[in-house]
Regions:
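Active-site core of glycosidic bond-cleaving carbohydrate-active enzymes
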Residues: 1-257
């Protein structure tokens, strides 16, 4: 329903993520301090919507790719995407509490993050196939990126992710939410050649197809002929890879600014 658009966690969590991105880039924690109480209220709201640690509303991996009309997440379960984002912002809040020396909140939200991680693994992990959710690229990339996969299973899940990309002819199936986690999971695991192969072509899904089509701005859909907006801040997550991985311009972990 419309509430998915009004309060999808993948967009709402920007309120928590952005102050940290600002801090990591500039070394300025003023936004974390200024908005801490609001960040906490938002997370406490998500907790009221969770059922045993699982958040089940929102748009999921919006506009993911396949032989269907783009829109609501089709390749990846909405609760998997929503719960992973819930986990991410709770982790951030625990870190914010540590920065503010709020020991009660550190303990509270660290414990909550562990409970969410356990619930996520219980709900979505398939031990027999070593995959999460449907085994889609987003299903496996999200928990890998967020460090939710148990150490013993990590390589197998990553191998399954790579196998799925290859099974799709070195093409992605992620949408506007999953792209970042897919791209960064590959980059952080030294799979930049695969990233290059996945994007260095002129077919949909791919940026080359948009260029060949004549687009001068990013389009909302991988194939602009399908309609939707032809000037949209969408699918631009490769920028982060250009800067961080290709050009080597990135922040040093643990050294903000």
């Amino acid at each position: 329903g419309m509430d998915a658009f009004a309060e999808s966690p993948e967009w709402g969590c920007t309120f928590v993520v952005l102050p940290f991105m600002y801090y990591e880039t500039y070394g300025d924690d003023s936004l974390i301090r200024k908005y801490y109480n609001g960040m906490r209220r938002y997370i406490d709201y998500l907790t009221t919507r969770a059922d045993n640690g699982i958040v089940s509303f929102g748009l999921g991996d919006w506009y993911d790719y396949g032989d269907f009309r783009a829109g609501f997440s089709r390749n990846t379960p909405v609760p998997l995407v929503a719960t992973a984002h819930y986990y991410m912002v709770v982790r951030y809040l625990a870190e914010a509490a540590r920065m503010l020396d709020n020991r009660y909140d550190v303990a509270c939200y660290t414990r909550l993050s562990e409970e969410i991680k356990e619930a996520f693994h219980r709900e979505f992990y398939h031990k027999d196939t070593r995959q999460y959710g449907t085994g889609s690229q987003c299903s496996n990339a999200l928990p890998l990126f967020l460090g939710m996969v148990p150490a013993d299973d990590r390589q197998a899940v990553l191998d399954n992710l790579v196998a799925d990309i290859k099974r799709h002819g070195n093409r992605l199936t992620t949408g506007d939410v999953g792209n970042r986690y897919l791209f960064q999971t590959l980059a952080r695991n030294g799979l930049n050649e695969l990233m290059y192969t996945m994007h260095n072509h002129e077919e949909a899904p791919g940026y080359g197809f948009q260029l060949k089509f004549g687009a001068t701005t990013l389009t909302e859909q991988w194939d602009p002929r399908q309609g939707s907006s032809w000037n949209h801040f969408m699918m631009g997550q490769i920028d982060e890879w250009f800067f961080n991985s290709l050009a080597g311009i990135r922040t040093v972990e643990g050294k903000p600014g």
